[in-house]
Amino acid sequence: MNKTLNPQEVWIKAVRNLEGFFSSPRVIGYLKKASPSIEGESLIITFPNSHLASVMDDIEVYDATKKTILDSYPSIKEIKITISPDVLEKEITEEINDLVQSMEEEDFALIDHTKPVIPNFFDQNTRVNFGGGPNNHHPTTGVNPRFTFDNFVVGKSNELARAASISAAERPGKSFNPLFIYGDSGVGKTHLLHSIGNYAKFLFPSLRIKYVSSEDFTNDFINSISSGTSQKFQEKYRQIDILMVDDIQFLQKKQETQESFFHTFNSLHNSSRQLVISSDLPPKQLMGFEDRMRSRFECGLVCDIQKPDLETRIAILQKKCQNEKKEVSMEILTYIASCFSSSVRELEGALLRIFALASFNKEEINMTLAQKVLEDLGAQRGDKIDPIEIIEITAKHYDLAASDLCGNSRVANISIARQIAMYLCRELTDVSLPKLGYIFGRDHSTIIYATRRISDLIGKDRKTFSDIYKLTQFILRR
């Protein structure tokens, strides 16, 4: 423990600094309710309940808080957000009991009904005792703190996947191992994987957790071969307690990488370490994989996430309105939800554009405005849009070459045009992050960063909003 710092003084100073940054009394009021503590090089910020902790779901609040603390206290390397264990136990137990009751009324063929669907999450005797004490140095987890079970909207289309994910986080290696989640792009698979990591880390602070995309795993494997560090690569992945691999389908036909993953899988599974895998297809339909690999995927629980039904889509929009502190009538939310039936990302993107247009035009959010935005977005459009076409159109708009947007130039006008093209590809296509990263010649994390940056600029900079608006219309009406 860092004995030179008083956690209470650290937190009081941080909140005072943030008072000049945020005008909302709600944000500061919520932060003042938290209790700080220091563990190693981490400042632990504990909220009394999940409602108060939700203030940290706002990326602006989270980033500002982290920057304020880390800039003021160099000995603190990270902040961790937690909820009072007693309250969290009560909240989750009630939620899971309700879900288990609803599950018992239906027939889930994929579950072994000789075992309980969801174990007693808070039975201390069932928890797995992993090696490594609290002072163990953990590798970078790759887990995004913004994605939690608390802000995952539940509906009939995803309740089984969510319940199984919670169970895997609560009893790593003992409940549904491996857990294989599949579904179309944009339905919430990645959100669940990050939620597993965040919840497990809260329950088991010493746990070694790793989230990777299949692209990350492939790059690590290739780099280990080229640098002669294969042994370190094996040690890195085979000492993990929970390994989550996103978009496994992109390992198809990569025989050497598959062989490495096969042995990693066996090593972890034989040691009762938890594996969670996501894909756009069920194991049986994964082409380019050996039968032995597909059979490994099927030896635990395989569950899918369907496209969200209308009620769930409305609930997602309501949650987004709550997070953005916007009031939108149920009539408008229902209309928006009825226009987007497949991707949660498209659904939320449409709502954010309505917010932005209303803000810039200084008008109320009404049905006329919503209809205009959705018409311009080409809601329920049937034909697919090619990312290459988006790159070419964006480059032409900024009087650049398409190769500039896929190149390495950091010149300001090229950089912003590139990020706008990435944002449009993410918003207007169903192409996965790894594939977009490949198209732009970058890691998928760059696509995520660009999307967030442009999303933020849309609400603040009229020119960015205008450019996005014009480009979107041109692309959809091409």
UniProtKB/Swiss-Prot annotation:
State its location(s): Cytoplasm
Q: Where is this region: Domain II?
A: 96-141
Is-annotated flag, keyword ATP-binding? yes
* GO CC term, one of those recorded: cytoplasm
Instruction: Tell me where it mainly resides.
Output: cytoplasm
Give the UniProt record's GO annotations in the biological process aspect. Answer: DNA replication initiation; regulation of DNA replication
* Annotated segments matching region Domain III, AAA+ region: 142-358
Q: How does it assemble?
A: Oligomerizes as a right-handed, spiral filament on DNA at oriC.
| Comment block on domains | Domain I is involved in oligomerization and binding regulators, domain II is flexibile and of varying length in different bacteria, domain III forms the AAA+ region, while domain IV binds dsDNA.
Q: Which PANTHER family match?
A: CHROMOSOMAL REPLICATION INITIATOR PROTEIN DNAA
Which protein, by its recorded name, is this? Chromosomal replication initiator protein DnaA
Protein species of origin: Tropheryma whipplei (strain Twist) (Whipple's bacillus)
The primary gene name is: dnaA
